[in-house]
Amino acid sequence: MEFVFYVCSFAAVVSTFFVIIQKNAVYSLVYLIISLLSIAGVFFSLGAFFAGSLEVIIYAGAIIVLFVFVIMMLNISDKYNLEEAHYLKPRFWIGPSILSLILLLSMTYAIFFLRDKKIDGFLIDSKIVGINLFGPYVFLVELSSILLLSALVVIFHIGTEKNVDKNKVL
């Protein structure tokens, strides 16, 4: 399982690097999905199945959908060429395809050849996570939820302003 851990870690670092350097938001989202899935692979290889499942369901599912909605609300199609035909070019899909293929090969290797092997650790279930989140860290959880909600309201406000001078700097 160490091999799968290192492969997923490498894919996470590379895809996160591409998230940072991409100018186009849609390209960045594709690399972010690969980054989140590779981090879930790291969790699965460490035996933290609950954390890996949460990574896939919450982050790679719900948060990415939220980011897509934000991109749609901001209406950045004038600044960047966001035509669908532009995304079908092979140049766009080479990097994500290679990283996804690396993740797929490492996961199939882990499923078929490393059935009983894992990195030592203990199983964390949802009860332990809930007790820790809403026990001593309840203030931090509530604070982060308020921060995320306020960021969503600000982005919605910026995206829906109609009479904004494009040369005006905020």
Swiss-Prot record:
The similarity comment for this entry is:
Belongs to the complex I subunit 6 family.
Keyword Transmembrane listed? The answer is yes
Name residues in a coiled coil: none
Q: Look up and give the membrane topology term.
A: Multi-pass membrane protein
Q: Report the superkingdom from the record.
A: Bacteria
Q: Which Pfam families match?
A: Oxidored_q3 (PF00499)
* Annotated keywords: Cell membrane, Membrane, NAD, Quinone, Translocase, Transmembrane, Transmembrane helix
Q: Report the EC number(s), separated by commas if there are several.
A: 7.1.1.-
PANTHER family per record: NADH-UBIQUINONE OXIDOREDUCTASE CHAIN 6 (PTHR33269:SF17)
Name of the molecule in the record: NADH-quinone oxidoreductase subunit J
Q: Which GO terms describe its cellular component?
A: plasma membrane
Query: Where does the UniProt annotation locate this protein?
Result: Cell membrane
Q: Does the keyword Disulfide bond apply?
A: no
Q: For this UniProt entry, which segments traverse the membrane? A: 1-21, 30-50, 56-76, 94-114, 138-158
Q: How does it assemble?
A: Composed of 13 different subunits. Subunits NuoA, H, J, K, L, M, N constitute the membrane sector of the complex.
What Gene3D superfamilies has UniProt attached to this entry? NADH-ubiquinone/plastoquinone oxidoreductase chain 6, subunit NuoJ
MF GO annotations? NADH dehydrogenase (ubiquinone) activity; quinone binding
Q: Could you tell me which InterPro entries the record lists for this protein?
A: NADH_UbQ/plastoQ_OxRdtase_su6 (IPR001457), Nuo/plastoQ_OxRdtase_6_NuoJ (IPR042106)
Protein purpose: NDH-1 shuttles electrons from NADH, via FMN and iron-sulfur (Fe-S) centers, to quinones in the respiratory chain. Couples the redox reaction to proton translocation (for every two electrons transferred, four hydrogen ions are translocated across the cytoplasmic membrane), and thus conserves the redox energy in a proton gradient.
